[in-house]
From Swiss-Prot:
Residues 38-62, 114-135, 244-270, 417-449, 625-669, 925-964 form a coiled coil. It comes from the Eukaryota. This is Centrosome and spindle pole-associated protein 1. InterPro entries: CSPP1. It comes from Homo sapiens (Human). The keyword Coiled coil applies. May play a role in cell-cycle-dependent microtubule organization. Residues 189-208 have a biased composition (Basic and acidic residues). GO terms for biological process: positive regulation of cell division; positive regulation of cytokinesis. Phosphorylated. Phosphorylation increases in colcemide-treated cells. One of its GO terms (cellular component) is centriolar satellite. The gene is CSPP1.
Length: 1256
């Protein structure tokens, strides 16, 4: 039940005075939370006090205790104070203890013996341990797991259960662990150094005790300390204490009581070990302590290994007077007070370099005053400076006084309130500073927080990029503890028995002020960067009760750069420089060093030398004694030896650590650990086993038990390719690895081989079986791949054959189609050739018949000419002609001229052709010349056909002239002529106008004409029947109407011609030749009608076969009125049947060539020619009666023809239209030129242009 009392007392202490509870900035932050718990625990504290009062009553009533009745009440009250103050301060049990601090020896002053006290303390310790285990039972495992992960160790409780899974701690956890580790190391050093000094002091008899008491009255150490403390407290007291001084004394008393109480737990054990340590003090206490640490049953070996590693990482915090292994002696129960919050244990140790000088010093007299040195420590719970000697004396006097707690009043409460407020402000500043540091670390993305330079995840040079490498010349001196100004120190005493000479200014607290200087505050913590610097100018003298607000943690971290990446920056060799404590001290005193782990032969000499060398007490002698110099030299040599040993050990540990890192690097698996769902891989990252395939094989084995043999082999085969490694390699790897790191194998046999044993025969056999099975699998896989490749090859060949056959079939079909196409083309070509041949034969037959007819016609013409000559001669003799009318003189002269014969025409044509050929430009193509030469042969035949057509036209015109009045207007459509030749337009890049038929509908007049023509065509008549046979469809527009009207007129004219030919024998023989001559020379409006009705709707210039060019066609081609026959002549011709000049009707245009296929119908031409020949024969055989003109005309047809106005019918059938072939045009142009040459004075006579090219 003691431990809950401690917790409650701590809470109460924090509430009363939080400055006394501060250990570090982190514990300051926790203090508000603890203050909140204080109100709830007040009742619990009162109950504990009542229980203690009951115990007191029982002890008083007990007979063995009645012997000490006079002292029991005081002691028991002081014991209660000790318990409460210990719980408040929570001072570690091995903290510093002074010889004359408290005059109470709890438990040892009873007459029950040492066995009773030993059992009592043992029971108390067991109760504490049980209660602590109860509190930390559920959380210790998780915290230990984090500790294992942070130190890269393996939890032994998880061995054989599962593979360790590497977890990463957060930055906050790593920071906390690193801080705890650093401060624990610091506290352990302080504890061990203080323990060493206490052991030396216990072995030394105080000088004041010898002076006041005889030797026979000396009692055991603890009893003598109590009596000495009480005797020292009875010394005279010159000063009157103020409330502040009383408060300071009370605090000192509490601290001393707590140190005393903490020591009681280990007092029996220390008493047993004291004699052994005395004998082994000179040799070294580290070996014995190491053995004691190793012999502890509560701490496992694995934890001991971790302590070694921590020492390696925290080497920079070692002190020159600190043994490397002393820190391991600290018991594990002092590390943490409670594992549920991992709070830093209040283990307050002191590792200052002059700690051995601050033990229980013998009292020195100054003017009758007893000067006693008390053990003043730097407490992280009160942030106090070293108290002065007067305060210590008053505290020692109050130790035996029950009224010590009643010396301060309202003024002390105000001071406590001010300190609390100051403490609260400091906490707020620290919290703000911590937030700023976190924000800066986050902004700069630093990987170093407050975890120090030993973070295993960060490289030593990680801060170079931020230019934060340590710069010694820029660093500032850490804060110093305040001190009172002092005079120049005097040289120390040569002998401790000589009384000191009083100083010039006898200040009672001079020695304490000297101890509170720079050497006292920073001697063991300040790094060597401030060693050669003198202290700053001294401040004015301070009051004796002045308290600094800083604690040990402030001075500890203030003198160190936690972000320094260099390990050597805080090496053990650099931390042992003693700073200059005084400005005016001699050089010999500034080099004073503490005595570490050395025990002289004379205890009194050692103690006095420690006091002298510490520089805390000065004497009047100017030179030290030989003994002090000798001890100083021995201390220096001892320090040099220890430093060399320490460096050697550090080198060994560094080599061991590097070897361990190399071993870890060799065993590092970049692919991660297998198992737990992760695939098993070899060193190269390849999968060792395929779990999916194994699962399928298991299913197949369940359904097919016959194949179970292969599955059994797979199940027992080792999967670890590293089992065949040699035994030496396994041993070497196991030696290089840390004991906390477990080497996990990716094999099912790894659990039996975790310590590097060589593989057994069974494992080797299984490995061979596995290798054979792997080879079997490889062969089987190769066979499957080969079979697959063969199957693919066969499939590809089959596909290629199919494609080849398909290509051949397509090619054959294509060739067949091409052959069929060629056959069709050949057949079509043969058919065309046959048609052409037949057409040529028919053409030749027609030409032969034409030649025969032409011959017959020539004979007839010759016969007619002869008859005309005979008739002319007869008429000359019979009567004289009437006088010629002047208007008809030119016409008559033209009538008297003989028409040219066929031979003359041919000769003139050849002549003109030769002349035009000589003058023709080299424009025409060769083909036109060849074609013209071939066409020359057919010119005569064409002329004969033209004569027949002229004869029929002549008769038609004669009939019309008889029935027309002289004042009838001849409507002639004129066409605008393009004044520019077509080639000139092409040369000037002009577009020739094209006349197209208007798309408009029929007007009323045209529609009426069509209707009347249809009625006329339906009448029964021979000519109309032929017209219906030729034109089956009725006319639809003006153009077709003109064509059919012209055809009807032509048929009627044929009928009239036949009638006239029947009565041709009766006509005068001169009428026919004169009429034919006039017909041949009759001027015609050839150009106007040709261009007006031609299908070629543009004015074009044409080039002849021999290169001649046609002249421009004139629009004014109508004969003058003088050339028109008069009414008298028309009446005369009517009665005499003479042909007179008159305007000829319009001729339908013809845009087709003479020998075009569309205009030549061989069968129709043959029938018509036969009909003409028949009529011609009848005309020759039957005599013509020229006097009876009525026999030549059909009265009905004449009357019907008169009623029809054919002036608008200017079109004709294509084969009856005027010739438009180039040959006829050229021939007519030649004829025109020839006629103009013969009769220059008569232009425009005898033109062949515009004649019909019909073959009928």
């Amino acid at each position: 039940m003691l431990f809950p009392l401690q917790v409650a007392a701590v809470t109460s202490s924090v509430r009363d005075d939080p400055l006394e509870h501060c250990v570090s900035p982190r514990t300051r932050a926790r203090s508000p939370e603890i203050c909140k718990m204080a109100d709830n625990l007040d009742e619990f504290i009162e109950e504990q006090k009542a229980r203690l009062a009951e115990d007191k009553a029982e002890l008083e009533s007990d007979p063995p205790y009645m012997e000490m009745k006079g002292k029991l009440s005081a002691k028991l009250s002081e014991n209660s104070k000790i318990l409460i103050s210990m719980a408040k301060e929570n001072i570690p049990p091995n903290s510093q203890q002074t010889r004359g601090s408290l005059g109470i020896d709890y438990g040892l002053s009873l007459p029950l013996g040492e066995d009773y006290e030993r059992k009592k303390h043992k029971l108390k310790e067991e109760l504490r341990q049980d209660y602590r285990r109860y509190l930390t039972q559920g959380i210790t495992q998780g915290k230990r797991k984090k500790n294992f992960l942070s130190t890269s160790e393996t939890d032994p409780s998880t061995l054989g259960v599962s593979l360790p899974i590497g977890e990463r701690l957060s930055a906050k956890e790593r920071l906390k662990l690193e801080r705890n580790k650093e401060y624990n190391q610091f506290l352990r050093g302080k504890e061990e150094s203080s323990e060493k000094f206490r052991q030396v002091e216990k072995s030394t008899e105080p000088k004041s005790q010898r002076n006041k008491k005889p030797i026979g009255q000396v009692k055991p150490d603890l009893t003598s300390q109590i009596q000495t403390s009480c005797e020292n407290s009875e010394g005279p007291r010159k000063d009157v204490l103020t409330p502040s001084e009383a408060y300071e004394e009370l605090l000192n008393q509490r601290r001393l009581e707590e140190d005393r109480y903490r020591q009681l737990d280990d007092e029996i054990e220390l008493r047993n070990r004291r004699i052994i340590k005395k004998a082994n003090e000179e040799v070294g206490i580290s070996n014995l302590k190491h053995q004691r640490f190793a012999s502890k049953a509560g701490i496992p070996d694995r934890r001991f290994h971790r302590f070694n590693e921590d020492r390696v990482f925290d080497r920079r915090y070692h002190r020159p007077d600190q043994d490397p292994e002393v820190s391991e002696e600290m018991d594990e129960r002092f590390r943490y007070e409670s594992d549920f919050d991992r709070r830093l244990s209040r283990v307050y140790t002191n590792d200052r370099m002059h700690r051995n000088k601050r033990g229980n010093m013998p009292p020195m007299e100054h003017d009758g005053d007893v000067i006693e040195q008390s053990n003043i420590r730097i407490s992280s719970a009160e942030n106090k400076s070293a108290p002065d000697n007067e305060t210590s004396k008053s505290a020692n006097q109050d130790t035996c006084s029950p009224f010590a707690g009643m010396l301060f009043g309202g003024e002390d409460r105000e001071l406590i309130q001010r300190r609390k407020e100051k403490y609260r402000l400091e906490l707020l500043e620290q919290m703000a500073e911590q937030q700023r540091n976190k924000r800066r670390e986050k902004d700069l993305e630093l990987r170093v927080a407050a975890s120090g330079a030993q973070d295993p995840e960060k490289s030593p040079d990680r801060l170079k990029q931020f230019s934060v490498a340590p710069r010694h010349f820029e660093e500032m001196i850490p804060p110093e503890r305040p001190r009172i100004a002092f005079q120049t120190p005097l040289p120390p005493l040569s002998a401790p028995s000589v009384p000191p000479i009083p100083s010039v200014h006898p200040v009672p607290s001079q020695n304490e002020d000297l101890r509170s200087g720079l050497s006292s505050a920073l001697g063991e913590m300040v790094s060597p960067r401030i060693a050669p610097l003198p202290p700053p100018p001294l401040l004015p003298p301070l009051a004796t009760n002045y308290r600094t607000p800083y604690d040990d943690a402030y001075y500890f971290y203030g003198s160190r750069n936690t972000f320094d990446p260099s390990l050597a920056y805080y090496g053990s060799g650099m931390m042992g420089v003693q700073p200059a404590a005084y400005v005016s001290a001699p050089v010999t005193h500034q080099l004073a060093q503490p005595v570490v782990n050395t025990v002289g032969q004379n205890e009194l000499k050692i103690t006095s030398d420690q006091v002298i060398n510490s520089g805390l007490i000065f004497e009047d002698k100017p030179k030290p004694s030989k003994q002090s110099l000798q001890s100083y030299q021995e201390a220096l040599q001892q320090q040099i030896r220890e430093r060399e040993e320490r460096r050697k050990k550090e080198r060994e540990e560094k080599e061991e650590y590097e070897a361990k890192l190399e071993a870890e690097m060799r065993t590092y698996n970049p692919w991660g650990k297998g198992g737990g769902g992760a695939p098993l891989r070899d060193a190269k990252g390849n999968l060792i086993t395929d779990l999916n395939r194994m699962h399928r094989q298991n299913i197949d084995a369940y359904h097919n038990p016959d194949a179970r043999t292969y599955e059994d082999k797979r199940a027992v085969v080792s999967l670890d390719p590293n089992l065949a490694t040699s035994n030496a390699e396994n041993l070497e790897d196991a030696a290089n690895k840390s004991s906390g790191h477990m080497q996990t194998q990716s094999s099912p046999f790894a659990r039996g081989n975790v310590f590097g044993e060589p593989p057994t025969e069974l494992q080797i056999k299984q490995q061979e079986l596995y290798k054979n099975f792997l080879r079997f699998q490889i062969e089987e896989k190769k066979q499957r791949e080969e079979a697959e490749r063969e199957r693919l090859r066969i499939a590809e060949e089959k596909e290629e054959r199919r494609l080849a056959e398909q290509r051949a079939r397509i090619q054959q079909e294509y060739e067949e189609e091409q052959e069929k196409k060629r056959e069709k083309e050949e057949e079509q070509r043969l058919k065309n050739e046959e048609h052409i041949r037949l057409a040529e034969e028919r053409q030749k037959e027609a030409e032969r018949k034409k030649k025969e007819e032409e011959e017959k016609y020539n004979l007839q013409l010759q016969h007619y000419c002869e008859r005309d000559n005979l008739i002319g001669e007869e008429t000359k003799h019979m009567r004289q002609p009437s006088p010629i009318v002047p208007a008809l003189q030119n016409k008559i002269a033209s009538k008297l001229q003989r028409p040219p014969s066929v031979d003359s025409i041919i000769r003139s044509f050849i002549h003109e052709s030769s002349m035009s050929r000589a003058q023709s430009p080299p424009v025409p193509a060769r083909k036109n010349q060849l074609r013209a030469e071939e066409e020359k042969k057919n010119v005569i035949m064409e002329l004969s056909e033209m004569r027949k057509q002229l004869r029929s036209e002549e008769r038609r015109l004669q009939e019309r002239l008889l029935h027309m009045d002289s004042d009838d207007e001849i409507p002639i459509r004129k066409k605008e002529r393009n004044p520019m030749d077509i080639f000139d337009m092409a040369r000037h890049r002009l577009q020739a106008p094209v006349r197209r038929q208007s798309p408009k509908g029929l007007d009323a007049a045209t529609f009426q004409n069509v209707h009347d023509f249809n009625e006329l065509k339906d009448r029964d008549s021979e000519t109309r029947v032929d017209l219906k046979f030729m034109y089956l469809d009725p006319p639809r527009d003006h153009h077709t109407l003109e064509i059919q009207q012209q055809a009807l007129l032509r048929e009627q004219q044929k009928r009239l011609n036949r009638i006239k030919m029947q009565e041709g024998a009766k006509v005068d023989l001169d009428a026919i030749p004169s009429a034919k001559v006039r017909e041949q020379r009759m001027p015609r409006d050839d150009t106007s009608d040709f261009l007006k009705n031609s299908l070629l709707e543009s004015d074009s210039a044409f080039i002849g076969a021999y290169g001649e060019t046609y002249p421009a066609i004139e629009d004014d081609v109508l004969p003058p009125p003088s050339q028109l026959p008069s009414a008298r002549e028309r009446r005369r011709n009517k009665w005499k049947g003479l042909d007179i000049d008159s305007s000829r009707p319009n001729v339908a245009p013809d845009g087709l060539s003479l020998k075009s296929i569309s205009s030549v119908n061989v069968d129709e031409l043959r029938v018509r020619n036969e009909e003409r020949m028949r009529r011609l024969n009848e005309f020759h055989n039957k005599p013509i009666n020229t006097d009876d003109e009525s026999s030549l005309v059909d009265p009905d047809d004449i009357m019907k023809h008169i009623g029809d106005d054919g002036s608008n019918s200017v079109a004709t059938e294509p084969w009856l239209r005027p010739g438009t072939s180039e040959t006829l045009k050229r021939f007519m142009a030649e004829q025109l030129n020839q006629e103009q040459q013969q009769i220059p004075g008569k232009p425009g006579t005898f033109t062949w242009q515009g004649l019909s090219t019909a073959h009928g």
